[in-house]
Design a protein with these regions (language model features):
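Class I S-adenosyl-L-methionine
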Residues: 1-172
Length: 172
């Protein structure tokens, strides 16, 4: 697949300023767990960064996120993502972040991410998530994908049952 054709399918990647590589973002409004937590004071999603600022100031950002979400339905999405990630522009950075905004939508989406990772073995993929059901599928996770469970509440202890976690704390 040509890169230009792959880009038509996946829509675009983002390049978060504070990250060393490219990312693929979806609309935070469609997060399954985060969409509920955004209404809960004390949760890490309360006041979600991806639901304000540039994400709302520039309508084309939100529009692109929804196009990316819709692109997941394409039977060519896995091949297209792998083509773009394997391109020199993206692969030279050696790391890729899934969901600088948004989260895994369902098992089909997770399976597609697994397939993309298998097709891009030279890349270290990083995927933060609040979708705890993914734990049931960690045994199938490719070695080059680090799935980090983000705790749902501020000052919540890390989940000991996950190999990689992240927390938000008010002190320390």
């Amino acid at each position: 697949m040509l890169i230009k054709d792959a880009n038509k399918i996946i829509v675009s990647l983002s390049k978060p300023e504070k990250m060393p590589g490219f990312a693929y973002g979806l609309p935070a409004w469609e997060c399954k767990t985060g969409g509920k937590l955004v209404k809960v004071p004390g949760s890490v999603c309360f006041g979600c960064y991806a639901m304000k600022g540039n994400y709302t100031r520039f309508p084309e950002i939100r529009k692109s996120q929804y196009k990316r979400l819709d692109s997941l339905k394409s039977p060519l999405w896995v091949e297209a993502m792998a083509t773009v990630i394997n391109s020199e522009r993206v692969s030279k950075l050696k790391v890729f972040r899934w969901h600088d905004a948004g989260d895994v939508q369902d098992l089909d989406h997770l399976n597609k991410i697994f397939e993309v990772c298998k097709l891009t073995p030279q890349i270290t993929h990083w995927m933060p998530t609040r979708e705890a059901w993914i734990k049931d599928h960690l045994n199938r996770c490719p070695d080059n994908l680090i799935i980090r469970l983000s705790m749902t509440m501020i000052d919540q202890p890390a989940a000991g049952s996950w190999p990689n976690t992240s927390t938000v704390v008010t002190t320390g």
